[in-house]
Structures are given as C-alpha cells and as structure tokens.
C-alpha cells in the first residue's frame, strides 16, 4: 500500500480523508521519499495547496487508519502529461457535461481529460465523475424491452423478428444513447437459434443504433419474442499517441480502421484467416478491441471479434456464410479498432460459427437517465 508514494511519471494519486471533506491532490514526477514530504501544517482556512505535516511513522499510521489511496494511471485514460486536475470544487466553478447537468458535491475532486486528440489542448475540458451519466431515450413503438443494470443495458425483443434466408437483417434497436466523452459502448448479442448470429457492434454517440443478424441456415428464420438478447456495456476509451502505432491511420472519433493491404477471396461456407502488418506499443493494461466493419457485414461475411494485445500482429477470422465466392479488394475496411482498459474474453461456442465476446467489467457503475420518446 505504501508503494503508492513512488509511481511512474505523470501519474496522479488522490488521497481522501474519510472523516472530512478535505482532499489532497498532487502529481508525482519523480520518486518521492516519505521523509521528503513537506512539513507545513494544513490549517482549516486553507484548501489544497499544501501537504499535511507528517513523518514516516505517522504517515504510515495515517494511511492505515484514516486515508484511502486511489491511483488513476493517466496512460489508461489518454490524459496528456499537461492534463488538468481541478483544485477546488466550489459551486461557482461548476462545469456542465454535454449529456446532463452534473451537480457536484462540495469537496469532491473531479478529474478532467479530453477524449479526442483534437481536444487535448482545447480550452474546454470534459468532466468525468465517479458515476458517468448516460442518457437513454427509448422510443415508445420500439420492438425491444429495455432493462438497465448498474453497469449495462439489456434489450430483449418483444415482437417477432424475420430473418430471410441468405440475407443480412438490419434490426433497429429504437433507442438513442448519449454517451459521455471518454467512453464507448459495445453491443454483444445472443440468439436462442443456433443458426442466427448477432454481429458485435461498438458505439460512441449514436442516435440511430442498429445491429446485424445473419441467417446461417438454408431457410428463413422466425425469431419469437425473447429469442434475441442484446447487452450494451460501457467502457473507457483511449487514443494512443502516433508514435505508439505502427501502420494504422489516424482515428475517427476514437475508432481506428483496419484496411485490407492486399486483395483476397472468401470461399462459400468456409473460413479464411487474414493477417495484417500492424502493431502498437501502448501500456500493458491496454488492449485493442477489433469489431467487424459494417461494409464487411453487409456482404454476408461473419468476422469473429478479436482481442488484440500489444506487440502482436492481428489476425482476423472470416467466415463466408453465403453460397457464393466473395472478392475483397485492397483498401476495404475489414474491422474497426478501439483501445480500452476493459476486460474481455471469448467464450468458446462449438455449436456456433464464431466464438462470442464477453465483457468482464462487472464492477463498473453508471448513472442511467431513462426517457421515453414518441419518435420512431
């Protein structure tokens, strides 16, 4: 626990006193010894400009009894080294988020960081609270029932869904989401019919969310109410620096695009694995989530979601669910990539065409604001 005093460069530690509303914030730019702490007493009329008068023994006792140490590694959230940390949280200095009017509690420190590279030196900061707020607008004539948990949104079909044979069915979820800056959503689906596959989708800020259903059988499918379930999990996103990426184009709204470097063909009802000359060298805690692109899904190609780790070359597993050979030209987007510190796994599905992605971040918490809408 005491090793939190010596951290890497440009990481921040927030020390919170449980018995009062006073917080101590500081950046650690070098290894700090406990004996080198300032000895200036902190009085009641001062706020966050000085450190408490402690020595090594009293400081350890203070950590064990009255203090909770919380470490937020800046590289995980894409905060630049000149990131801003608020030193006061008085009401006259409140800032509003884009999604809701966030009412801060007095004395609660809030960390601001930009999400996109274009905003890193911008004047407007983005407020990230302990429980990010997500606005959910559900259309009244929706075909989906919406259930909100502490960390995700679940949608279950309440009407019949017709999936034609040898076609890709695009299903509108009839919900709109306003996701706070710095986060994204990942949609994973499951169907009770083994011949119906749900394509994984990522969303950043969508007002017209739709998913793809693929029929792998030789006849049309009729999905009964309750046969299809979609889960929307929300995770923090990260934009690596340009020197951390190899053979990847700049992102669009925090999403990178993996394009085919050479042409290839996908034979009918068969698998093919394509390798790409790309790599990244970010922090160990980061991983890249590779989601099939919409252009590929519309062709009837089923791509298995890939969890791309650092210092490795990505490989994409493609299944041609159609009865014809599909030609993939050079330059077409195969997959979309987003970087996050979330935790995932691929569940082995022997009876399915591809394995299923599962999000393991069950301890995260979000504040959902639900609103019913009359718009179709």
UniProtKB/Swiss-Prot annotation:
Gene3D superfamilies: 2.70.40.10. It comes from Human herpesvirus 6A (strain Uganda-1102) (HHV-6 variant A). GO terms for biological process: dUTP metabolic process. The keyword ATP-binding does not apply. Its cofactor is Mg(2+). Belongs to the dUTPase family. Its EC number is 3.6.1.23. This is Deoxyuridine 5'-triphosphate nucleotidohydrolase. GO terms for molecular function: dUTP diphosphatase activity; metal ion binding. InterPro entries: dUTPase-like, dUTPase-like_sf, HSV_DUT. It holds the Pfam family dUTPase. Keywords: Hydrolase, Magnesium, Metal-binding, Nucleotide metabolism. The keyword Magnesium applies. It catalyses: dUTP + H2O = dUMP + diphosphate + H(+).
């Amino acid at each position: 626990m005491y090793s939190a005093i010596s951290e890497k460069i440009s990481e921040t530690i927030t020390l919170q006193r449980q018995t009062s509303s006073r917080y101590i914030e500081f950046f650690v730019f070098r290894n700090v010894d406990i004996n080198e702490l300032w000895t200036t007493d902190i009085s009641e009329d001062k706020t966050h400009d000085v450190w408490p008068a402690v020595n090594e023994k009293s400081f350890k006792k203070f950590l064990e009894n009255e203090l909770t140490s919380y470490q937020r590694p800046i590289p995980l959230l894409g905060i630049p080294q000149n990131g801003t940390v608020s030193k006061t949280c008085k009401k006259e200095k409140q800032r509003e988020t884009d999604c809701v009017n966030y009412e801060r509690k007095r004395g609660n420190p809030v960390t601001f960081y930009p999400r996109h590279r274009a905003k890193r030196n911008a004047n407007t900061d983005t407020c990230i609270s302990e429980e990010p707020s997500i606005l959910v607008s559900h259309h009244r004539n929706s075909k989906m029932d919406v259930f909100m948990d502490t960390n995700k949104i679940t949608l279950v079909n309440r009407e019949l869904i017709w999936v034609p044979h040898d076609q890709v069915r695009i299903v509108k979820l009839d919900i709109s989401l306003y996701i706070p800056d710095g986060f994204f959503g990942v949609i994973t689906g499951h169907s009770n019919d083994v011949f119906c596959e749900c394509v994984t989708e990522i969303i950043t800020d969508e007002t017209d969310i739709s998913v793809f259903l693929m029929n792998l059988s030789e006849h049309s499918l009729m999905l009964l109410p309750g046969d299809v379930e979609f889960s929307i999990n929300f995770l923090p996103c990260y934009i690596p620096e340009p020197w951390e990426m190899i053979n990847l184009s700049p992102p669009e709204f925090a999403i990178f695009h993996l394009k085919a470097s050479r042409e290839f063909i996908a034979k009918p009802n068969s698998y093919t694995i394509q390798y790409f000359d790309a790599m990244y060298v970010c922090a160990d805690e980061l991983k890249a989530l590779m989601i099939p692109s919409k252009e590929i899904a519309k062709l009837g190609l089923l791509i298995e979601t890939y969890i791309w780790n650092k210092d490795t070359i990505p490989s994409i597993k493609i299944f041609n669910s159609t009865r014809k050979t599909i030609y993939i030209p050079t330059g077409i987007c195969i997959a979309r990539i987003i970087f996050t510190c979330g935790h995932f796994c691929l569940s082995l599905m022997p009876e399915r065409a591809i394995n299923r992605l599962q999000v393991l971040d069950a301890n995260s918490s979000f504040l959902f604001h639900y609103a019913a809408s009359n718009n179709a």
